[in-house]
A protein has these predicted regions:
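Catalytic glycan-binding domains that act on GlcNAc-containing polysaccharides
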Residues: 21-192
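Residue-level signal for mature regions of secreted extracellular proteins and peptides
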Residues: 10-11, 25
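Sec-dependent signal peptide recognition
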Residues: 2-10
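C-terminal motif of bacterial Sec signal peptides marking the signal peptidase cleavage site
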Residues: 13-16
Length: 192
């Protein structure tokens, strides 16, 4: 086999290893199963919990809602007249679905210029940073997955202005996140 062909095969094999997972864990309703299937998730979330104080179960519930644990998740495309692509709904990307502007702010403030939204350790650190600021600025408990999610989704100004009250669907989503966080907390107490 020629050197060029061998090099091409090696390059293709390495490229397929990728940074973030592009598929969801098999059982997203079982925190222990998720962490057994993806041990790097637990390592990243524990590091975030130690650094920022955000419990693993709160991080898991938020990531479930934002990306279903898919590292390269993006918002859907928008179409004009149902067929003409007009770009994506927002710049949200990765596990945390962080917007470009908020991600840039995080990178600047934390001096993490190499951080990537499709790497679980960077995404959980971002969430920890954001949620700890929400706790400091808005008085939201780091254990309150429901309120933390509302502040995460609406932004801290939107949360302070209670913009979520005009979005009953979002209040329902946040309540579901609160329930999922409690479910994950119960499960994690048995498998850690």
């Amino acid at each position: 086999m020629s050197r060029l062909l061998r090099a091409s095969i090696l390059l293709l094999a390495l490229a397929s290893c990728g940074g973030g997972n592009s598929s969801a864990p098999q059982n997203m309703d079982d925190a222990c199963a998720i962490l057994r299937q993806r041990p790097a998730y637990f390592k990243a979330m524990r590091a975030t919990e130690r650094k920022w104080g955000v419990p693993v179960h709160v991080q898991m519930a938020a990531i479930y809602q934002e990306s279903k644990f898919i590292g390269n998740a993006r918002t859907p495309h928008q179409f004009a007249l149902g067929v003409i692509p007009m770009g994506r709904q927002s710049s949200a990307y990765g596990y945390s679905q962080a917007l470009d502007g908020t991600w840039d702010e995080y990178q600047q403030e934390q001096r993490r210029f190499g951080a990537k939204r499709d790497r679980i350790n960077d995404a959980t650190d971002f969430m920890g940073w954001y949620m700890s600021q929400s706790s400091a600025k808005l008085g939201i408990s780091l254990n309150d997955a429901e309120s933390q999610y509302l502040a995460y989704h609406e932004g801290r100004t939107g949360f302070a202005n209670k913009s979520y009250l005009e979005k009953p669907w979002l209040v329902d989503v946040a309540a579901a996140i609160g329930r999922r966080s409690a479910m994950y907390a119960g499960q994690l107490s048995y498998c850690r």
